[in-house]
UniProtKB/Swiss-Prot annotation:
GO terms for molecular function: structural constituent of ribosome. Keywords: Ribonucleoprotein, Ribosomal protein. It comes from the Bacteria. The keyword Ribonucleoprotein applies. The keyword Membrane does not apply. It comes from Rhodopirellula baltica (strain DSM 10527 / NCIMB 13988 / SH1). Residues 177-210 are annotated as: Disordered. Gene3D superfamilies: Ribosomal protein L17. This is Large ribosomal subunit protein bL17.
Length: 210
């Protein structure tokens, strides 16, 4: 019995399973890179199709990487206060490199670099890490969590009939819900205008009765 054993085996050894999770998460992040630089660009950025079990297993890793990247963005903004606009290799850049301002820049940027290294240890792809920190993380700055969604596909996989699913990043391919417009009705006449008419009718009725 597999009591107290977390996760799915997926029919693989631990090393093979770890490599699978790293490749799936990197593949999801790389779908957001510049399509003009990719010969095999995805049809829909921010989306991969895999089996339902693999999607559920890799989802926590993707969420963790996005959280690390998102929390490191304030350190990058703080470091911009101390950076220089001089060209690398110029005399002005060399002077800045030896100044106290560079030390402040390096100290402010240290949490950002540390987060990049941690994510690189998790997924092992430098290009995917660059896409995550440069493109994807800014999209979720105001979102407290839940950066991905899993949608089950109706058509199973050919060969073994495995259940397929879409794992995608939220916020870009969301459906736009349209609410129906409220019907406009003619406004009823004000009570002050209808009151004199009602009094006139009652006077006519009493006069005719007499």
């Amino acid at each position: 019995m597999r009591h107290r054993r977390k996760g799915r085996v997926l029919g693989r050894s631990p090393a093979h399973r770890k490599a699978l999770m790293r490749n799936l998460s990197s593949a999801l992040f790389l779908t957001e890179r510049d399509a003009s630089l990719d010969e095999n660009a995805p049809k829909v950025p921010g989306r991969i199709i895999t089996t339902l079990e693999k999607a559920k297993e890799v989802r926590p890793l993707v969420e963790k990487c996005i959280t690390l990247a998102k929390r490191a963005l304030p350190a990058l903004e703080e470091a911009k206060k101390y950076e220089t606009s001089a060209e690398r290799g110029s005399d002005e850049y060399k002077k800045w490199r030896k100044s106290e301002q560079w030390t402040q820049w390096a100290d402010a940027r240290a949490p950002y670099v540390n987060a990049q290294r941690r994510v690189l240890q998790l997924i092992g792809d430098r290009e995917a890490v660059a896409v995550l920190f440069d493109t994807i993380a800014e999209r979720f700055t105001d979102r407290p969590g839940g950066y991905t969604r899993i949608m089950r596909l109706a058509k199973p996989r050919l060969g073994d009939g495995g259940t397929r699913a879409i794992l995608e990043l939220v916020g870009k391919n969301d459906r736009v819900t349209r609410s129906a417009q409220r019907p406009a009705f003619e406004q009823d006449a004000p009570e002050s205008d209808s009151a004199p008419e009602a009094e006139a009718k009652t006077e006519e009725e009493t006069a005719s009765a007499n």
